[in-house]
Amino acid sequence: MSWIDRIFSKNTTSNSKKSNVPEGVWTKCTSCEQVLYRDELKRHLEVCPKCGHHMRIDARERLVALLDKDSIVEIAADLEPKDILKFRDLKKYKDRLSAAQKETGEKDALITVSATLYGMPIVVAALNFSFMGGSMGSVVGSKFVQAAEKAIELHCPLVCFSASGGARMQEALFSLMQMAKTSAVLAKMKEKGVPFISVLTDPTLGGVSASFAMLGDINIAEPKALIGFAGPRVIEQTVREKLPEGFQRSEFLLEHGAIDMIVKRSEMRETLANLLSKLMNMPSPFVEPELIQEKSDDV
């Protein structure tokens, strides 16, 4: 074999090895830009193991990681959006819906379930940002209301994970109506003494932040989540000024009293269980039975 044949042979072998690596095995952190093994990132619940950056996570993956195994029962799973206004921008609304449904496997942006968390009954809603930016339309509003009413019926807490760009413009006034609708059912929950915990994730903006997302009895945020009404770019263009560093991020909002606490995704399950046990006047799931017995003997 001549020297030129050997070079071509090496190149061919190298290219063939590269092509054998399946797509999607590796990904890059959107913050530190470290190359990460996809399965490892999934094990860390989409949190970068190098820098701790919280990336966006699929709503169903979040629910499975949070709730007790085999306890999840979906609420209002049959609701599906309709193009009542025959809305069209660059595309028809019905085409956008079809594309989002095909991409995510969901009928709309909100998933609502009843389940248990460390054995405690709970109702949970989670917005999926991958479905049209987690935007709130009539189905999202209706599913949220049904979840809240289920929580009232069971007299158990409602927890909502928000990840949304706001109201869905393709539904116009129908989407704006959901702001009042969701706020009204939360007022009803308050009257009945049923707690609501709102968890704000990246991003929570627009009509969602201006309605149910900021109405929790306790408002929690994930680290460095973007939270506000308009995004920072829009604000800067409007006021023609540079915003402070970290403006509208979780840490800024906590410092200024707009939220109650910041909780890492890996600690969310235990934190929620502790909070809910206190709100519902139930024993903490992390107190050992022997300790409870010792306390009762002392009394």
Curated annotation (Swiss-Prot):
Residue ranges annotated for the CoA carboxyltransferase N-terminal domain, each copy included: 25-294
InterPro entries recorded: AcCoA_carboxyl_beta (IPR034733), Acetyl_CoA_COase_Trfase_b_su (IPR000438), ClpP/crotonase-like_dom_sf (IPR029045), COA_CT_N (IPR011762), Znf-ACC (IPR041010)
Cofactor info, note text: Binds 1 zinc ion per subunit.
Catalytic class of the enzyme: transferase
Cell location: Cytoplasm
UniProt keyword terms in alphabetical order: ATP-binding, Cytoplasm, Fatty acid biosynthesis, Fatty acid metabolism, Lipid biosynthesis, Lipid metabolism, Metal-binding, Nucleotide-binding, Transferase, Zinc, Zinc-finger
Gene Ontology cellular-component terms listed: acetate CoA-transferase complex
Gene Ontology molecular functions: acetyl-CoA carboxylase activity; ATP binding; carboxyl- or carbamoyltransferase activity; zinc ion binding
Zinc finger (C4-type): 29-51
Any one of the GO BP annotations: fatty acid biosynthetic process
EC number(s) reported in the record: 2.1.3.15
Keyword Transmembrane helix: no
Pfam short name (any one): Zn_ribbon_ACC
Pathway where this protein functions: Lipid metabolism; malonyl-CoA biosynthesis; malonyl-CoA from acetyl-CoA: step 1/1
Chain residues that bind Zn(2+): C29, C32, C48, C51
Catalytic reactions of this protein: N(6)-carboxybiotinyl-L-lysyl-[protein] + acetyl-CoA = N(6)-biotinyl-L-lysyl-[protein] + malonyl-CoA
Cofactors named for this entry: Zn(2+)
Record's function text: Component of the acetyl coenzyme A carboxylase (ACC) complex. Biotin carboxylase (BC) catalyzes the carboxylation of biotin on its carrier protein (BCCP) and then the CO(2) group is transferred by the transcarboxylase to acetyl-CoA to form malonyl-CoA.
Record-stated family: Belongs to the AccD/PCCB family.
Subunit structure, as described in the record: Acetyl-CoA carboxylase is a heterohexamer composed of biotin carboxyl carrier protein (AccB), biotin carboxylase (AccC) and two subunits each of ACCase subunit alpha (AccA) and ACCase subunit beta (AccD).
HAMAP family linked to this entry: AcetylCoA_CT_beta
Protein name, as recorded: Acetyl-coenzyme A carboxylase carboxyl transferase subunit beta
Naturally occurring in which organism (per UniProt): Histophilus somni (strain 2336) (Haemophilus somnus)
Source species taxonomy: Bacteria, Pseudomonadati, Pseudomonadota, Gammaproteobacteria, Pasteurellales
